Amino acid sequence: MIYAVFIFNNKGKPRLTKFYTPIDESIQQKLIGDIYAAVSTRPPTACNFLESNLIAGKNRIIYRQYATLYFVFVVDEGESELGILDLIQVFVEALDRCFNNVCELDLVFKFQEIHAILAEVVSGGLVLETNLNEIVLAAQNQMPKTKRSNAMPFSNTLSSFATRF
């Protein structure tokens, strides 16, 4: 089960927080700070998995850094670490396709669309969809027509994504 999903910038400012388990808001704020501190202090050569007891007993923090953003999933021991890393990759690629070179400002100003894309991937702490084309299609169908017309074609997206990361 996925307990929470976070996106932080490199200064520790949360750009997306989604908890799939009920936790008091004061505890949520402490968890966000603790998770960012644990992830941001690790050297780039370190493994992207951390053992943790922060949420619901024993769990794992799985993260990946893209440019100035940390994408963090907190999961139970039953989830595959490599599967979650792939899920993070799919989520980032979906964001990149939907927002034409996604950046931190997209996360700030288009947070509803970001949450909608995340809801296509994860719901209630369970993975719903991993097919990138299905996720992008569902997300684009939810966006207003003006935003959809600005979406980048599929062939250009992968090449721009590969050069950015």
Swiss-Prot record:
Part of the AP-3 complex, an adaptor-related complex which is not clathrin-associated. The complex is associated with the Golgi region as well as more peripheral structures. It facilitates the budding of vesicles from the Golgi membrane and may be directly involved in trafficking to the vacuole. Keywords: Cytoplasmic vesicle, Golgi apparatus, Membrane, Protein transport, Transport. Gene3D superfamilies: 3.30.450.60. One of its GO terms (cellular component) is AP-3 adaptor complex. It is found in: Golgi apparatus; Cytoplasmic vesicle membrane. One of its GO terms (biological process) is intracellular protein transport. InterPro entries: AP_complex_ssu, AP_mu_sigma_su, Clathrin_sm-chain_CS, Longin-like_dom_sf. Adaptor protein complex 3 (AP-3) is a heterotetramer composed of 2 large adaptins (apl5 and apl6), a medium adaptin (apm3) and a small adaptin (aps3). Belongs to the adaptor complexes small subunit family. It comes from Schizosaccharomyces pombe (strain 972 / ATCC 24843). This is AP-3 complex subunit sigma. Its main location: Golgi. It holds the Pfam family Clat_adaptor_s.
